[in-house]
Amino acid sequence: MMRRSLFQRNDLHYKNKEVMITYNAEGIAMPKIKKRLTSKWIKAVAASHGRKVGEVGYLFVNDDKILEVNREYLGHDYYTDIITFDYDEDDVINGDLVISLDTVRTNAEQFGKSYDDELHRVIIHGILHLCGINDKGPGEREIMEANEDRALELLATLRSE
């Protein structure tokens, strides 16, 4: 049984028979990402973890909106770069990912990364969560970061093709 998305989706998506990845923005300008390339990358990363992509929705927001979502749905009173809502079914990943572009920009500056690199790191971070990789327990953060690094290397390869 398919679930209904937490967020209303527009027509910005990459779709084929098995995959639907949507990209929307609320209260902030849509980031300049190559949607087809990003969707191909997401599908490849999921496949490398033995998963298929079903319905994945990205919602890009500002800090005020992510704080609202964090409070309303998770009971947390703090800003974050991404919140992942997991609706996985067996080996198919399904979920909504809410990304604060304000926090992405702040983190890029803090960590000395480009905005584009940090945005793609956060985009794939949510997919890795949907693939079952956690980052809260002992040693898990290092595993997550290693997976992010491998995924970003794959993105660089796909961009050069």
Where are these regions (language model features)?
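An acidic/histidine-cluster motif and surrounding catalytic segment
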Residues: 1-120, 131-161
